[in-house]
UniProtKB/Swiss-Prot annotation:
Classification of source organism: Eukaryota, Fungi, Dikarya, Ascomycota, Saccharomycotina
Keyword Nucleus appears in the UniProt entry: yes
InterPro entries per the UniProt record, alphabetical: ARM-like, ARM-type_fold, HEAT_IPO9_central, Importin-beta_N
Name of the coding gene: KAP114
Note: Present with 2940 molecules/cell in log phase SD medium.
GO molecular function, one term: nuclear import signal receptor activity
Acetylation among keywords: yes
GO cellular-component term (any): nucleus
Domain Importin N-terminal: 21-100
Biological source species: Saccharomyces cerevisiae (strain ATCC 204508 / S288c)
Descriptive protein name: Importin subunit beta-5
Amino acid sequence: MDINELIIGAQSADKHTREVAETQLLQWCDSDASQVFKALANVALQHEASLESRQFALLSLRKLITMYWSPGFESYRSTSNVEIDVKDFIREVLLKLCLNDNENTKIKNGASYCIVQISAVDFPDQWPQLLTVIYDAISHQHSLNAMSLLNEIYDDVVSEEMFFEGGIGLATMEIVFKVLNTETSTLIAKIAALKLLKACLLQMSSHNEYDEASRKSFVSQCLATSLQILGQLLTLNFGNVDVISQLKFKSIIYENLVFIKNDFSRKHFSSELQKQFKIMAIQDLENVTHINANVETTESEPLLETVHDCSIYIVEFLTSVCTLQFSVEEMNKIITSLTILCQLSSETREIWTSDFNTFVSKETGLAASYNVRDQANEFFTSLPNPQLSLIFKVVSNDIEHSTCNYSTLESLLYLLQCILLNDDEITGENIDQSLQILIKTLENILVSQEIPELILARAILTIPRVLDKFIDALPDIKPLTSAFLAKSLNLALKSDKELIKSATLIAFTYYCYFAELDSVLGPEVCSETQEKVIRIINQVSSDAEEDTNGALMEVLSQVISYNPKEPHSRKEILQAEFHLVFTISSEDPANVQVVVQSQECLEKLLDNINMDNYKNYIELCLPSFINVLDSNNANNYRYSPLLSLVLEFITVFLKKKPNDGFLPDEINQYLFEPLAKVLAFSTEDETLQLATEAFSYLIFNTDTRAMEPRLMDIMKVLERLLSLEVSDSAAMNVGPLVVAIFTRFSKEIQPLIGRILEAVVVRLIKTQNISTEQNLLSVLCFLTCNDPKQTVDFLSSFQIDNTDALTLVMRKWIEAFEVIRGEKRIKENIVALSNLFFLNDKRLQKVVVNGNLIPYEGDLIITRSMAKKMPDRYVQVPLYTKIIKLFVSELSFQSKQPNPEQLITSDIKQEVVNANKDDDNDDWEDVDDVLDYDKLKEYIDDDVDEEADDDSDDITGLMDVKESVVQLLVRFFKEVASKDVSGFHCIYETLSDSERKVLSEALL
């Protein structure tokens, strides 16, 4: 075959010609891969060939390498191997193309990609000279291509072991330092070397205190040399080089400095050295600010972008060292620079004023962009005192004297917002005076007739931050809060600017964060405030897009939180809230934030609702819900965001039943059939998940007498969901449905229970979906909590794939317990497994499950692809032993979680401890960290005797468990230890010292 003809054919515009050529190329490769690879490499080498053909040759090699080069690739075909001498030729050609500075960029990039691919399987064993060639190119020619290639190899190929023990790290660092120290190396070469330094630092950051001394010494020496060189580089003057390159050079230096500061031990970067770099960083920030101030917007967009990127890296470094002492002069320099750098560009001002949605995205933190303002925010929120208090005074004073310079004023107000978000308290002399002047200035901005809308919007956002920060310092905080909120809302209602309205709505959430508005405003004014906010939401909602819709729902959620506690006394507000929930969410049903917030709003609206009001809302909503379901019948309920949203809303309505009874009959009458149809015909995973959840609540919260005639239809739905024709993901919520059916119809379905449970168990054993697995286990928890023996009897009565169901279920259950999270789910599993442990059943004693993972002990270096094909091996342990170990592990985890009550009483307890320290008659008995079983039992028996009169309720079924997880576990261990249940004594002896210590600390 002629390779040139195949390449031309494979690039043809005609689909048939293209497919024929591609097929022929693969067939040729299957018969003689070496010949094809050699032919493609020769085409890539030919400068007289067209660029397209050369590029296609490299793209073909890139694809074929994974199929014919080595079994190390997952897509390896093993039909024809590339011969060793051809491999050598290919490697040589690729390096020649990649390292040739005069080569076309596309060709260099294509060759580089192939090199990285091959090195992933060949380096270092089959390609030991790879790095030598690259190092030579860097050392002798300062090759940018070589440094770029080495960077890519570091990302994809070089392992930690290669870096430290294989000598690659040392060789690379020597090359990097050589390029950076050589005066004749170009600025571009130094930038490339600095990028390579970052790759090396990433490798070194994996080291820890337990590493060998040689690694520690290597890292320490490299970091010391790096810091020395980086400091020298910052002092270099490249007057004859373009500004953009100089700024990129500074950026990468500060990027490396930040990484060293944040990702390595403090001992490597002394405070004295940090101070020296801090001085240089402030100077560089001033220089960058000067460049920024003198750049015409139309002159150079790339220059402005580079200025802002460099600013971000410098401020990020200052943030990393912000715990150092800053002088007043240094702080003034930083504020002056950031005030200029954080000024909005004319383009941003135009975008925000013409489309308020972009403003909302940025202010709510949902915009994808990251700019110098964001980094300034990080800096100011990280500053400790006294710098924080100092900077507050400076910025407040600057605001007072900049009211006529609007661009500067907006920037200063933004910086003030950042300062106020710092968690530290702002203190110091004359703070009260500065605060009063600031509040007066902000008040003047609100009443001014000539202030531009961006300044007004920024002031509206800043005011609640000021009030929040100084809530304890302002004697008139309540009237101030009420007055400023009223002024902001009235301004927004009068204004025709959507920017002002949206800023006010965001600010409203800030007020809600620190103030209980119903208490601050009083019931009447609070209701008026709700009405105003609802009116503003209505005014902007028609033009709201994406992030703004989510923000509006968040505001609405806050509004609903202040609804009167009396049963729905203000119907106008409630109806308006309902209307907004449905209109905003239906405008953007694919928006995750909107869906989540709208559900939250609806749940709040339905809290403690009585039957009459519930029926009123159902009359409003139900017809539209059913219309959406019916309209999707024709396409078998194919996924759509609106259908999912409606199913979410239906679920909320069915879950939040009236507080004075079951769901009204109308719900069952009109919703049962549409939901049953969705569950009968849909093949969409998400649709089936949502519909199953709604259906479960419909059954659970409807009067059994009203639902009983539909029992056969319910069983048909259940049969489909438990069948293996429905995917694991789609059947995710079938567990709660089974529990709902068992709860409501235990007598009616008695003859079918065995079949249902067998289907549940089969589904549980087969499923690979964690959520589905955990929900199906809820059924077993339900059964075990009610009758553990009958549950074991049932599971012992049949087999799945020639293994008894009891063994399979217990293995699955034990594996699932380790990943279960969520308090209610953890509790039900603890109660159920506890019941099985107390049962002391011989059938359970015979079950063995996976214990600890057995580590690989061979001599092979296990690659990722090899690891995937090697099954994990575990020590096999008795079920009861594993239950104890799981419970100890859970107890250890839960005991480390902070307890609010303990936090509140910690000071009191500390006083008691201090008092007891001096008490010579202290009759506390010292307890060792780890107790043997007899000693443990002795302490517990004493404890049980003391608490014998406590009349604690027995835990049965799946009732609400008031005890915490820790209390449940402690009670379990006290009982099994005191009574030696199911051979606990023997199990205890097998526990590790750390496990015994957990029990000792928890029980005593």
